[in-house]
Amino acid sequence: MVPSRAEAADILLDLDPPDWLLAHVGAVAEIATFLAERCAARGIAVDRELVEAAGLLHDIDKLLPEDDPVQELGHGAAGARWLGQRGYPELARAVAAHPITRLLDADRYGRWNGVATREERIVAYADKRAGQRLEAMSARFAGWAARYPEHRESLARARARAERLEREVCETAGVSPLAVRRLRWVGPALDAARRRRSAERPTAATRA
């Protein structure tokens, strides 16, 4: 089962995400939605709902307790397993495939690139274009290099693979990297989820 926008928003809010993570996953989801819509406009089949939900929930394991058993799987795979356990196995591949670590190792990247679905590629690319907002991939990699200076060489190799991914995704969508945009929907979906949760919360009068 693929969660709807409303269901994905509820899953995310259940884990009390901080504002910085909401900004990031919101940007990823909206960039991914834009790319899926552009593919669809060209008659190219893409599961838009899967792309939206995976984009919004791709970092879900960052919100789980450190002692949750799934954390042993590492970032991405942990979130995929957790979502699968809750009835959303369709999201697993796109969530597991998004981390930058997928691009660091040539053999691992080669295996993934040979079997990756269009939805996986879109979500993985959207993550490389979003920090707290839409940004150039060069800015995203500069941020990683600043945070992990000991991995500069491997990040440079990963960037070359990310540029290949960018070419593939953007060519499929029929846009240039400079033309990539966000298709806004996450803010309204989260606001609606918060209103629902507030309305469902028992008041002092109903508790009495």
Language-model features: where?
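A short, charge-rich alpha-helical start-of-domain segment used by transcription regulators
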Residues: 20-23
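Residues within well-ordered alpha helices
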Residues: 11, 35-38, 82, 169
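Divalent metal-dependent catalytic cores for phosphoryl transfer on phosphate-bearing substrates
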Residues: 13-14, 41-147
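Conserved N-terminal diphosphate/IPP-binding helix and adjacent helical/loop segment
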Residues: 2, 25
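Charged phosphate-binding loop/patch that engages nucleotide di/tri-phosphates or the phosphate backbone
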Residues: 153-208
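A positional/architectural concept
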Residues: 27-30, 34, 64
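Generic N-terminal amphipathic, Lys/Arg-enriched alpha-helix
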Residues: 3-18
